[in-house]
Each structure stands twice: as C-alpha cells, then as structure tokens.
Amino acid sequence: MDGIRVLPLSCDDYYWPKWTPDSLYGYDTPAGIDAAALLAELEQLCRKNANSLRRYDMVSHRVWREPFQQDYDLIVLEGAFGPQALLGQPLLRSMVYLELALPLRLWRRQRRDRRERGHSLVYVIRQTVLETLPGERDFIRPLRQKADLVIQNSPSGLATLTQHARSLVAP
C-alpha cells in the first residue's frame, strides 16, 4: 500500500474447527468465528510478539499454525464476520466498509468456491441466495453505519483508502 508495510489478516482463518454451520446462515455468521482466538492473535501482533499465524482450511476445516516473520506498519483485518466481535475494542483503531456490487461479489465468490472448494455453480448460487445474502443483511450491512470510512471498489476509493491508511501509521 504505497510504502506502508501491510500485514493482511483474514477473518476466514478464525472459523471454529469442526463447527456445525448455522441452520439459517450456514458459515455466513459471526458465530462461526472463534472471536477469542482472533482477539488473542491481534493482541500478539500489536505487541509485535507473534511468530506464527493461524490458518484454516475451508474444505477440511483443519486449523494449523504457519510460521510468520514479517515487518509491518499496519494490520489489515479482512473479512465480514470478525469485526463484530472487535467493536469497541481498542485494537480496532479504524473500520473500513468496502462496497461491491452484488454481481461482482457473486462472480468472485463462484470463481473462488469452484476453484478452491470444489463447489458447483448451482451450489454457490443456492448458498448465496439462502445463506450469504441473509447473513450479509443481518451481520455485515449494520457495520456500514459503524465504519470510519465507506468506499467503493474504484480508483478513487483506493486512493482514499491509501490516504486513510497513511493517517493511521503517521507518527
């Protein structure tokens, strides 16, 4: 991010292992995230005291630690179902809400889920309509009002995001 050393951290790596998906939302709910593990990891990273990062495999539901050694100025927590547990925590210095059009999200999701998870196109569409969209409505959209910055996926949005990131790491 233009001179800022960013450590990306994915909320998807904090799903509970062997968790039974919610009957209404499937995996598209904050209840699927081990918030205590996520918070503990963030605390270690903020103290620059971490030597491994948690990883989660969406197909096998296996959790493991991966060695980690990277200099960073900013931790970017990416994901839809981790921020809810961090609201009000001092570790969450800023929240950015990225808006993407539904067709683009569906296109990206079906590509990822078919390639990485072996799901069929019909399965991805069904999951999106029956689980993802209700989860988005109930858990993700409310974050928009709590965000410090709302951006569109556009060149001007990226410039605004970069400027915001610089303000967070400025001495």
Predicted regions and their residues:
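NTP-dependent small-molecule kinase module
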Residues: 70-72, 111-114, 133-171
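ATP-dependent NMP and nucleoside kinases share a basic, alpha-helical "lid"
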Residues: 64-116
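Acidic, metal/cofactor-coordinating or nucleic-acid-engaging core segments within structured domains
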Residues: 120-137
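Conserved nucleotide-sensing/catalytic segment adjacent to the nucleotide-binding pocket
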Residues: 7-8, 16-64, 69, 74
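Amphipathic alpha-helical transducer elements in NTP-driven molecular machines
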Residues: 32-35, 39, 99, 118, ...
